[in-house]
C-alpha cells in the first residue's frame, strides 16, 4: 500500500480550506479522491469525550440546563433505565394521543444525545408511546436509577441536579406535567376555571415538584398522591411557561 507523505496531506487540506472540492484536489495532487475525503474528515475517535461523573469514554452530549431539567422531569415521573449487554437503555412512557408531547420529547432526546441511538415504539394497540435512548452513561446522568419502583425507595436530587433545576425550573415543571400532569376545567357551582394537576405515587417526587413550584412563587395544593394549582395567576404563568398537553 502506497503511503503519501505529510506534505501531500497538508497541501490537500490547504486546498480543501480554500474551498476546492475533493475531486479537484485529487486531480491536482495525483491522489485518490477517497484519500482526500479521509484526510478531510476528523478521525472517528475524536467524536468521544469523557463522562464527567465516571470519567469513562462516551459520545459527546448536548445538554443545556433547560433540556436536562425537562428530561429529568420526564425520567423521574415516567422513565425507566435498564441495563443491557453492553450499554443502558432509558425508556420514557407517554400517552400517544398527545402527539405534540411525544414528538417534542423525541426531539429533546435527539438533541441531548446527538450521537446515540434514539427511537420510538407504540404499544397497547397504539395507545402508549415509548421513547428510548441507548447510552452507557444513563445512570451517571440520572443517579436516581436503582432497583425497584421509584415510589418504593427514596428519591432525592444530587446537588448538581438541584442547581440545574433551580436554573431552569419551568423546564423541569414542563417535563413533569407533560409526563403525568394535566390541565382541566374545574367547576364549582356557577364558576369554571382552569387548573393544573400533577400526580405521582412517590412522595419524594411530589416534594421535588412542590418545592420547585414554591420557589417560583406558585401556590400548590398538596394531596396524598397529587398536587393541584388552580389560582388564576399561577395558571396564567403555567400556561405561559409550560403550556397544555396536545
Task: Kindly label every feature range from the protein language model.
Residues 1-246:
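Internal intein/HINT superfamily modules and their associated LAGLIDADG
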Amino acid at each position: 500500500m502506497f503511503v503519501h507523505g505529510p506534505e501531500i496531506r497538508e497541501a490537500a487540506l490547504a486546498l480543501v480550506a480554500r474551498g476546492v472540492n475533493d475531486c479537484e484536489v485529487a486531480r491536482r495532487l495525483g491522489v485518490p479522491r477517497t484519500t482526500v475525503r479521509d484526510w478531510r474528515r476528523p478521525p472517528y475517535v475524536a467524536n468521544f469525550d469523557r463522562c464527567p461523573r465516571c470519567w469513562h469514554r462516551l459520545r459527546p452530549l448536548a445538554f443545556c440546563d433547560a433540556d436536562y431539567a425537562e428530561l429529568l422531569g420526564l425520567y423521574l415521573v415516567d422513565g425507566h433505565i435498564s441495563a443491557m449487554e453492553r450499554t443502558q437503555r432509558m425508556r420514557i412512557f407517554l400517552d400517544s394521543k398527545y402527539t405534540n408531547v411525544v414528538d417534542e420529547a423525541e426531539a429533546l432526546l435527539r438533541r441531548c444525545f446527538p450521537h446515540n441511538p434514539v427511537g420510538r415504539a407504540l404499544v397497547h394497540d397504539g395507545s402508549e408511546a415509548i421513547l428510548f435512548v441507548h447510552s452507557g452513561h444513563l445512570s451517571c446522568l440520572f443517579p436516581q436509577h436503582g432497583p425497584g419502583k421509584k415510589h418504593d425507595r427514596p428519591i432525592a436530587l444530587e446537588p448538581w441536579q438541584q442547581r440545574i433545576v433551580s436554573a431552569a425550573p419551568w423546564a423541569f415543571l414542563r417535563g413533569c406535567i407533560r409526563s403525568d400532569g394535566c390541565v382541566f376545567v374545574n367547576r364549582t357551582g356557577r364558576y369554571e376555571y382552569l387548573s393544573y394537576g400533577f400526580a405521582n405515587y412517590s412522595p419524594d417526587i411530589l416534594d421535588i415538584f412542590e418545592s420547585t413550584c414554591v420557589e417560583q412563587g406558585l401556590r400548590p395544593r398538596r394531596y396524598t398522591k397529587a398536587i393541584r394549582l388552580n389560582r388564576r395567576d399561577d395558571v396564567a404563568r403555567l400556561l405561559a411557561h409550560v403550556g397544555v398537553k396536545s
